[in-house]
Design a protein with these regions (language model features):
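Generic secondary-structure signature for well-ordered alpha-helical cores
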Residues: 50, 78-82, 162, 179-186, ...
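A short, small-residue-rich loop immediately preceding and capping a beta-strand
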Residues: 108-130, 134-144
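A glycine/threonine-rich phosphate-anchoring loop and its flanking beta-alpha core
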Residues: 132-231
């Protein structure tokens, strides 16, 4: 499979061809078997259950999502004589915590032979966890095109206060009923746009990681995501009118992003530094009563805007690697002081971040010096990748056109809060992202001034 070939394949063809040998040297598999995005899609449930030999599905839902689609799902099952059991979380919102996963397990009916999630983000992630543990096929009935995790093989959860991606299982089938999706709250619809905008920066950071630390990169997978992103960005006007074609474009784009993660075997094609803004805000909302949070896609969209602003600062100010400056910066860096800042801002989740550094040693002076030489040698390549990013003003304008927040003030963060969040995004995962590049160059705090 080549870039040109992938650009001429639609979602249905992508799924039907299954696994394929790619020009990157790997064999890619989509993970998902069925994706139905159309009006009346819930009516496909009996046939889907029959295809996997399931007689009694277990329905997992939140209170709000059951109100949105529960009646439609249960009516289809009952009209076709299909028995089912269900658990509807009594709290709203449902948070992606150990309690939520444990509650799902404790209410699971072991006479069931399939799992149907009714919802979006947290419900879907929890349903995938339940499916992996039970070994059952999982179907998600989406209630909003709000995030890209429908078919990915991981679940984004809060464990011990740290946002982590846990291996779960990809949905066997995605049911996107446009009669339901088009009626989702507008807030949820634009959230899906935000999660797609995140691909603007995640794709470039994936390429930067290949250049600097030798991470595997697949141009075919990247092209697939870029094509879906372009389609979503051209559909925003129709989305505001709840036009089925526009809503379908967003839903399919989010599914394609999940397939891309399955192709890559990691979240790189869909998630980078911009997502770590969101993760930190989620972690703080669990740790501190007065810390606010938003829909994942809203936070990821904000993170995208801030990430673009930071890369622009790097280019516009004409920064170039300064070996002496970078080495002195690292020499004077105090890991103990930094860990104290993490604990103060993030709360208990900081312990897992600190433990991650104990395993990775990204702040080790010798490792830094090695990366720095690569950065110096390949600076022109690095900046060429960064220069392919669209202007932040262009993305801000698009966001404003759909009433998308453009400042983290919407969740209570002032400029200092954004700057602190920014500096800590390098500590969430073991990925090489923009803030690691700025740290390696010894200019992290200087770049952060762009948020003043």
């Amino acid at each position: 499979m080549t870039v040109n070939e992938i650009n001429n394949i639609n979602l249905e063809e992508l799924i039907s061809m299954g696994s394929f040998a790619c020009e990157c040297g790997k064999v890619h598999s989509p993970g998902v078997s069925k994706v139905i995005v159309e009006k009346g899609a819930v009516n496909s449930l009996p046939a889907l259950l029959e295809e996997i030999g399931a007689k009694k599905p277990f329905l997992l839902s939140g209170h709000d999502t059951f109100e949105a689609a529960g009646a439609s799902v249960t009516a289809v099952l009952e009209n076709n004589g299909i028995d089912y059991a269900k658990y509807v979380f009594p709290v709203s919102p449902v948070r992606p915590t150990e309690y939520t996963v444990g509650s799902a397990f404790m209410h699971f009916d072991y006479s069931c032979d399939a799992i149907i999630g009714i919802g979006s983000g947290v419900i879907n992630d929890t349903g995938k966890m339940l499916a992996r543990a039970t070994g059952l096929k999982y179907i998600i009935v989406a209630t909003a095109p709000s995030m890209d995790g429908f078919v990915s093989g991981t679940s984004s959860m809060d464990r011990d206060g740290l946002k982590v991606s846990l291996y779960s299982t990809a949905a066997w089938a995605v049911v996107g009923d446009l009669d339901i999706l088009c009626q989702a709250p507008m807030h949820m619809l634009v959230s899906g746009v935000g999660d797609m905008l995140a691909k603007i920066t995640s794709l470039r950071e994936w390429k930067l990681a290949e250049i600097i630390v030798g991470e595997d990169y697949c141009p075919v997978t990247a092209a697939l995501v870029q094509k879906a992103l372009d389609k979503v960005m051209s559909s925003t006007e129709g989305l505001l009118k709840r036009e089925p074609e526009a809503v379908s474009s967003v839903m399919e784009g989010l599914v394609i992003a999940g397939i891309a993660m399955n192709y890559a075997g990691v979240s790189r094609p869909a998630s980078g530094m911009e997502h770590y803004f969101s993760h930190i805000w989620d972690m703080r909302s669990l740790a501190f009563e007065d810390a606010q949070f938003e829909q994942h896609g809203i936070q990821a969209g904000l993170g995208t805007l801030y990430t673009l602003m930071a890369y622009e600062e790097l280019i516009n100010k004409g920064y170039k690697p300064d070996r002496e400056k970078a080495l002195n910066f690292v020499k004077n860096f105090s890991l103990d002081d930094w860990n104290g800042q993490l604990r103060s801002f993030v709360g208990p989740g900081a312990e897992a971040m600190i433990e991650g550094e104990n395993r990775e040693h990204k702040y080790d002076a010798a490792k830094h010096a090695k990366r720095l030489e690569i950065i110096i040698d390949r600076w022109d390549e690095i900046t060429e990748v960064i220069k392919t990013l669209p202007p932040s003003a262009e993305i801000r304008k698009l966001m404003e056109s759909i009433d998308f927040p453009t400042s983290a003030a919407c969740i209570g963060y002032d400029k200092d809060g954004v700057k602190t969040t920014f500096t800590m995004t390098k500590d969430i995962r073991d990925k090489y992202v923009g803030t690691r590049l700025y740290w390696d160059l010894g200019i992290l705090e200087e770049i952060a001034e762009v948020f003043d």
